[in-house]
């Protein structure tokens, strides 16, 4: 792989998935409220960003996993799986009743649970957790379960 592309992918921060998680539902909302054009722009942009992030995971896997050793990054990482769940709603609008949409949604749920397990195993259980060690972003990891029922129409 080209070093320039690999360096570009390494530079993409994991928390960018939070931006994707905001863009996709906003696009779906705008579309449902009659603003199809701008809604689709948000959704397609989010889809493009998540595809680029998937490339980051594939081609810089070791670096991505190393970043998860940071408790703040690890607690924000589940926004990726939440964004995947919302992307499956957008894809269901584009390609109704396709098995790939359900497969993506279920895969995102499994990955979300895996990231939760990883976060608990690496950042909570091995250390004595004090209030100074807890960051507000930790709640993202566990509140993300709420995205499952909100996207379950897929």
Feature locations, PLM:
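Membrane helical hairpin/interfacial module
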Residues: 31-102
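A generic, well-ordered mixed alpha/beta core segment in the N-terminal half of proteins
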Residues: 89-124
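Juxtamembrane helix-loop boundaries in multi-pass membrane proteins
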Residues: 2-27, 62-89, 105-108, 124-150
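Sequence-level detector for tyrosine residue identity
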Residues: 44, 118, 133-135
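Hydrophobic, membrane-facing alpha-helical anchors
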Residues: 1-5, 48-65, 111-126
């Amino acid at each position: 792989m080209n070093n320039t592309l690999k360096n570009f992918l390494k530079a993409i921060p994991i928390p960018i998935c939070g931006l994707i998680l905001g863009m996709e539902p906003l696009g779906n909302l705008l579309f449902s409220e009659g603003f199809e054009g701008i809604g689709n722009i948000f959704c397609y942009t989010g889809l493009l960003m998540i595809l680029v992030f998937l490339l980051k995971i594939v081609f810089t896997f070791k670096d991505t996993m190393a970043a998860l050793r940071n408790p703040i990054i690890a607690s924000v990482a589940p926004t990726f799986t939440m964004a995947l769940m919302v992307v499956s709603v957008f894809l269901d609008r584009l390609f109704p009743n396709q098995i790939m949409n359900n497969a993506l949604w279920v895969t995102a749920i499994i990955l979300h649970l895996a990231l939760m397990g990883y976060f608990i195993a690496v950042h909570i259980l091995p250390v004595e957790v004090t209030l100074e060690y807890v960051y507000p972003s930790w709640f993202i990891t566990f509140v993300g379960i709420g995205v499952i029922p909100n996207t379950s129409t897929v």
